[in-house]
Structures are given as structure tokens and as C-alpha cells.
Amino acid sequence: GRFVRGLFPDQDGKLVPDYTLDASMYGLFAFGALPADDPRIESTMKAVGTELWVKTEVGGVARYTGDYYHRVSDDLGTVPGNPWIITTLWLADWHIARGTREDLERARNLIEWAVGHAGGGNLLPEQIHPYTGEPVSVCPLTWSHSTLVKVIMDYLLKLESVKLN
């Protein structure tokens, strides 16, 4: 089982789960509600890494299934939404928190993906075009930059602790 996006009342007032996969579920471990290795977090983040992964040469993680904000494709099986820098880095941060060598390698690849999508002047956009790799929407986005700095710091600290053990 993984987490649901939310519960919403139907016309009779009964709460109905919204099963839309959403990368923001990362917050459940990022804000300390549950550890990164909790089975529900693991199931959710693994689903984020597979089901929200953009299946083009560009790659990256979409915000949620069917994200329509600046959508450039209706092929939701291939492009569940445009890839975002922050959501891809959230997946990296989860791998860092898990801390296995395999997870750290995956995190490094995701960090390199984000850095590789910096535009002129090393500016990071909000989103990436899923087919061309060009910036979409806001650029630069401070949130993308600050998330990159945080994730790199987490990565280096975890890498050092793994070397010490």
C-alpha cells in the first residue's frame, strides 16, 4: 500500500480516496512524519520513481499523474506531466535518506539530471519540456536552486557518513 493524495467528500458526504500519484507525498518523510524506510513511504516513493518518471529521452519526475500546468503532451502513459527540477530532486533526497550505496548512486544520477538541465548562466527552470529538454515556465526558479543546494548538501553529508562506516 501507498499513500493516497487525499480524501474528498462525495455527494453523500462519504469520504472517497483520491489515488492520484503525487510527488509531494515526499513531504511525509521530508517533514519527519515517517522515516524514509517506512514501508508505506518506500512504496509511495518507488511508485513516484516509476509511474511519474517521464518516459522520453529527457526523463525526470512529473508533479502528479495528469498534471495540466503547461502540459505539452496528452500521452499520459509516456508523459504523466512535465518533469520538474524539484520533484526529481525530491526523489533524489529520498534515495539519500535511505543511504544505501545503490540509493546514493541513484541520487547522484538524479542530481546530475537536474544540473544537466540548467540553462544559460546555470539557471534552473521550474519545469522541463518532456521532448526537447528546454526550460518551461519560470526560469530561474529560486525553489529549484534552493532544492538543488539542499539535496547536494544532504548527499555529501550522507556520502561522508557512509565512508566513515
List the model feature ranges, each with a label:
Residues L15-P39, G81-N165:
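C-terminal capping/lid segments that line or modulate ligand- or cofactor-binding pockets
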Residues G1-I86:
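Extended ligand-binding clefts on enzyme/binding-domain cores
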